[in-house]
Regions:
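Peptidyl-prolyl cis-trans isomerase
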Residues: 214-255, 289-290
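C-terminal motif of bacterial Sec signal peptides marking the signal peptidase cleavage site
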Residues: 23-27
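Sec-dependent N-terminal signal peptides
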Residues: 9-20
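Sec/Tat-exported extracytoplasmic proteins
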Residues: 62-69, 99, 103, 107-116, ...
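N-terminal targeting/tethering segments
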Residues: 33-145
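N-terminal secretory signal peptides that target proteins for export/translocation
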Residues: 1-9
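PPIase-associated folding chaperone regions across multiple families
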Residues: 30-41, 48, 139-208, 251-356
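Extracytoplasmic/secreted proteins, especially bacterial periplasmic and envelope-associated proteins
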Residues: 53, 57-64, 86-95, 99-107, ...
Length: 356
């Protein structure tokens, strides 16, 4: 539950403000009507109504992400398996979704009469100039974008931010300590599933489940009698021994209702959820620092819910035209030049500079 540093805040702002990580809104394009076409202008990947996204814009965000991930995890990260696809495939899907969403948000902002001031337009030009000045000749050639086009992209990003701010302004700033409360607990876990011979997780039989419930009750009785909870974890639990820190939004409702009423050192009875049974000991019923941090997480989650209610209703009416085969040239496995400038960090430094 760490908060973002000021340097990183702008990098994740648009999507973090909607309670998701950068490029993690895969599936947004499913809310609009998709149509494959060959009728787009040269260099365009898709259009949402009259708002186009260019191949150069996709290359910019791809270059930004590709360099960051490779610097952190190495070049082989793209081959890593993620479910039924690779990390490269997953990131490409998320890049597509991010671009669909960005263009949709710009249209929505314009439909609501949101416009940029002359000062904001000037800041967009400053950001574009700084970005272009930091590109190597090789990176500039790969990008294939003029300073004017990049200025327009920074303006669109600003419009999207303004839209989120306007739509989510009704979210109250005050989040109670109890709503945001983070606690520390130890728990004994009894899974209601088992590993089948073919490697799948399957539900326990009725007889097996009855045995598990009996063991859970035995553990609860021993805990109530004063036996060492750590030793009981070692004896009974299907999960590692130790303590965990959780908020209300991390857990099943039945678990929340049973555990968040416990005081320090108090122990629950047997708690049953869909997937497991638990016996829980409360180590600390209020972690102050973590609770304060969690308030911002909750605030952003509420903003996300409000924003997407309006956004999804708006984009459901829009028509998207996709260039047939256009995305084949945009791939994280393709060669991309090194780039020392970051679109998001420049946006943050220009639009959210600390007052002097």
């Amino acid at each position: 539950m760490k908060s973002l540093s000021k340097k990183k805040r702008g990098k994740f702002w648009l999507l973090a403000a909607m309670c998701v990580l950068l490029l993690c809104c895969a599936g947004c394009k499913d809310d609009v009507q998709l149509k494959l076409t060959t009728g787009l202008n040269e260099g365009e990947l898709f259009r949402i109504e009259k708002k186009a996204c260019t191949e150069a814009e996709a290359r910019l965000f791809l270059m930004n992400q590709k360099n960051e991930y490779e610097n952190t995890y190495g070049e082989n990260i793209w081959k890593a398996e993620v479910g039924e696809t690779t990390f490269a495939g997953q990131m490409k899907d998320q890049l597509q979704a991010f671009l669909y969403q960005l263009k949709g948000m710009v249209l929505m902002a314009e439909s609501r009469g949101i416009t940029l001031s002359d000062e904001e337009k000037g800041l967009a030009a400053v950001a574009a100039k700084e970005y272009m000045a930091g590109l190597s000749v090789e990176a500039a050639s790969y990008l294939g974008m003029t300073e004017e086009q990049l200025t327009q992209l920074y303006q669109e990003y600003r419009l999207a931010e303004r839209l989120v701010t306007q739509v989510t302004a009704i979210v109250e700033d005050e989040i109670s300590d109890d709503e945001a409360r983070v606690i520390e607990v130890q728990q004994i876990v009894f899974s209601k599933k088992k590993l089948a011979e073919d490697g799948r997780l399957v539900a326990l039989s009725a007889t097996e489940l009855a045995d598990v419930r009996a063991k859970a009750q035995e553990a609860a009785d021993r805990a109530a009698a004063g036996d060492s909870f750590t030793l009981l974890q070692e004896t009974y639990s299907s999960e590692p021994v130790g303590s965990i820190r959780v908020s209300r939004f991390d857990v099943d409702k039945a678990w929340e209702n049973a555990v968040f009423v416990l005081g320090k050192e108090e122990i629950s009875g047997v708690i049953e959820t869909e997937d497991a049974l638990y016996v829980v000991r409360c180590v600390n019923n209020l972690l102050g620092e973590e609770t304060q941090t969690n308030k911002e997480v909750i605030r952003q989650r509420k903003k996300a819910q409000i924003f997407y209610q309006e956004y999804n209703a708006y984009v459901a009416k829009l028509l998207v035209q996709n260039k047939e085969g256009g995305w084949q040239s945009v791939a994280f496995t393709n060669w991309v030049p090194d780039c020392d400038v970051d679109f998001y960090e420049i946006y943050e430094s220009v639009f959210h500079a600390d007052p002097q």
